[in-house]
Amino acid sequence: LLKAPIRRCWKDTRSVKKIPGLAGRVRVGAPDASLTPASGVVAVAELVGRLGVSAALDDAVGVIKQRDRGLSAGQFLVALAQAQMFGAEFWSGLDRRRADTAGEALSVVATPASTTAAGLAERFGPMELAGIEEGVGEIAGRVIGLLPAARRAALRAGGATIDLDGTDVECYGSKKEGIAYSYKGARAGRPHVATWAEAGVVTAADLLAGDEDPRPGAGSLIERSVATLRAAGVTVRAKVRGDVGYFASHIAQAAVAAGCDFSLGVARNPAVWRAATSIPEKAWRKAKRMKGAQVAVCDYAPAGWPPGTVTVVRRVKIRAQDISADPRARRRRTIPNGQLALALDGLLEHVYAYSFIATNLDVSTGAKAVAVEAWHRMRTDIEDRIRDAKHGAALRHLPSATRAANTVWMWGALLAVNLSAWLQELAGLDTADGRGRNHLGTLRHRLLVVPARLVRHAGQVTLRLPPGRQLLAQVLARLRRLPIWT
């Protein structure tokens, strides 16, 4: 009789049967087209369909193709924004979305091929880009009309803030159009963005080169943002808010000409330092929500600025031992030179760091000045929107060789941020004040990129999600109670 082969397990070898779990017995079967990694696309489809987003953008942007076939301008913009919401980082990400058969069946718009999308983006000129902003205003108005009365009144009549800021997007390739070396030494494009702070919505944007100064275009951003707010039904006088990078008389004048008030950071110059030292000690008031900070008003008014401009001053007490020894430290620039020298020599126990705001808002009392300073400090809201566009969507890349295509890519990211804000506002994921919304990356994890099986049976379509607490059913229930825009 032949003996069976002897099964040996050497010293460093383990039997497959001894591997924990099922790892040793798993085989890969045939692909299942009923599975999707992104079941949340149905929530975006409900939002886009009920608000009429594609149609609103079509009406505002107009026709971008001679033949009426394939995607319209609005459908293309929705598809691009949706792809970035679901993780597309470059044009090739659209091809991965197209490969998701079940997800495409749930989508309200078809995802174009990457080459088609890049070609469509080239068709957008200045008029079409202006139409995107017009469409945003129309859609924002529809969203506000569906909100509870208190939130609707707060957005339309309670206060409207236009924030201004820019960001650099590092790029590679010496032949890219509209890309230049920034002051940081990197080749970059520079999205210049205006947002409606209370609604968390981008209202206007330009794509500049890395070496372009954003200040000359700030007046246009303000004017276009005001038009967007008016289209959304805002009746209150808007306020323009910006950091020290927008310290320019023509920006303040543009804000006033557009029917806005302004609050802009002031560059630290000898005149404003002298004005700060003349503030009586008894004039200082404790700042809101900032430990060790005090607020006062000085009589400094920059030359050429609108009548009624005053300067609000904030100072923060700093221990001498906490001052950085690095002469490049930013905090050192906020301390008067005389105080800084004495503190570094050990002759003072503490100093004050100063910040300045030029505004035409009412700061006639100490309480009003404190309120204005606390509100101005919230200008960092726009940094959160830009961060979401870069790390939640894909504004961290400008993937094309032409400025036109990169500008449309930028708007895809900004529309993704807007769709995220509108979705959370209407689905009850926000806290009814604009402060409780998730970043797009978190929303992607919690709602959008959740795997599911698409089941069709007896004329019904069912999504089977993994076990556990899922948001999709709750979100769909809320969205489906909304009327369909016609």
Residue ranges and their predicted role:
Residues 1-187, 191-213, 218-232, 424, ...:
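Dynamic "connector" segments at or just before major functional cores
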Residues 15-26, 263-382, 387-391, 477-486:
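An anionic, glycine-rich sequence signature occurring as long contiguous blocks
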